[in-house]
UniProtKB/Swiss-Prot annotation:
Active site annotation, chain numbering: 183 (proton acceptor)
Primary localisation category: cytoplasm
The encoding gene: panB
Protein's UniProt name: 3-methyl-2-oxobutanoate hydroxymethyltransferase
Species in which this protein is naturally found: Gloeobacter violaceus (strain ATCC 29082 / PCC 7421)
Function text: Catalyzes the reversible reaction in which hydroxymethyl group from 5,10-methylenetetrahydrofolate is transferred onto alpha-ketoisovalerate to form ketopantoate.
Length: 260
């Protein structure tokens, strides 16, 4: 039986870390699901790793839906969550609801992820959760606001900024978010937030004190040319693929094929 949003709460209660990764297509989603990943996110990071853009901003709702449908076919166990892309939910709770329902109805995801905190986003999260749509919050470095933040920088470094993030986390929990992603914030702050919340936190570049961890799978596997500084790849598939293609190319050019 597949995991639900309540399963993640139980993992936190048992002090069992949540394992989360991103997925963009069927084959990889199936591998990750069978490997026991708890949460799979079809993230707007696919704008960069799958579509070749330089930020998450250009990806559209229809593009993300296409990838979500492919990933859905490969997932049996993991909780499947989709990012709502930039420009598809910020205007109003009603706009967010209209977009989110497409992901649940057309792509079969179980929840959506929104970036940002109060006041506007807590109102939106409350509207969605009261309407039956589970929401994963996202605080700290929020890539959709990269221009406003002045780049991909650590957030919450000052006492005032840290206090604001704590308040936002509590507000999102109060609005009904089932979990929070904490990205690129000081490790001790991530631990403090995790301790104050009943809902689980999932960190990315936020240290070991969150209730789980998430990475972009392309970064984890060494497929990204320039991964974020906080990523320690667990494989070098870029080099492995290059070597395999090189061997194949050499065989074809020398013998026509390897079938003999």
């Amino acid at each position: 039986m597949g995991l639900s949003i309540h399963s993640l709460r139980k993992l936190k209660e048992r002090a069992q870390p949540i394992v989360a990764l991103t997925a963009t297509e069927y084959a990889m989603a199936r591998i990750l699901d069978q490997a026991g990943v708890d949460l799979l996110l079809v993230g707007d990071s696919l704008s960069m790793v799958a579509l070749g853009h330089t930020s998450t901003l250009p990806v559209t709702v229809d593009e993300l839906l296409h990838h979500c449908r492919a990933v859905r076919r490969g997932v049996e166990r993991a909780l499947l969550v989709a990012d709502l892309p930039f420009g598809s939910y910020e205007q109003s709770p009603q706009q967010a609801f209209s977009t989110a329902t497409r992901f649940l109805k057309e792509a079969g995801v179980q929840a959506v992820k929104l970036e940002g905190g109060y006041p506007r986003m807590t109102e939106t999260v409350a509207f969605l959760t009261e309407s039956g749509i589970p929401v994963l919050g996202h605080l700290g470095l929020t890539p959709q606001a990269v221009h406003q933040l002045g780049g991909y920088r650590v957030q919450g470094k000052t006492a005032q900024a840290a206090e604001r993030l704590i308040d936002q986390a509590l507000a999102l929990e109060g609005a009904g978010a089932f979990a929070l992603v904490l990205e690129h914030i000081p490790y001790d702050l991530a631990g403090e937030i995790s301790g104050k919340l009943v809902i689980p936190t999932v960190g990315i570049g936020a240290g070991p004190h969150c209730n789980g961890q998430i990475l972009v799978t392309h970064d984890l596997l060494g497929l990204t040319e320039n991964p974020p500084p906080f990523v320690n790849p667990y494989a070098d598939l870029r080099a492995l693929i290059s070597k395999a293609v090189g061997r194949y190319s050499a065989d074809v050019r020398a013998h026509g094929s390897r079938e003999e």
